[in-house]
């Protein structure tokens, strides 16, 4: 499973395109309570993700497994 494209939507929601042609929206608001993710509670920081190693990653090295994002996301038709 790989994230091939990602787009910030609003709040803590990101639209993700996966390598199996599925597009999902994931809301990460409740996923940021672990220490490494706390800086992401700042929305301006949260918005500055990139795709690295087949998933989304932030400047501090925080990332989420693409499988987790896929399972947590809601399919977009």
Where are these regions (language model features)?
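Motif-centric detector for short Cys/His coordination patterns
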Residues: 1-77
């Amino acid at each position: 499973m790989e994230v091939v494209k990602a787009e910030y939507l609003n709040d803590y929601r990101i639209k993700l395109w996966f390598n199996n042609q599925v597009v999902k929206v994931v809301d990460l608001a409740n996923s940021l309570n672990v220490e490494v993710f706390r800086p992401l509670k700042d929305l301006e920081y949260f918005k500055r993700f990139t795709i690295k190693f087949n998933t989304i990653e932030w400047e501090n090295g925080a990332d989420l497994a693409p499988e987790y994002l896929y399972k947590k996301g809601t399919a977009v038709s």
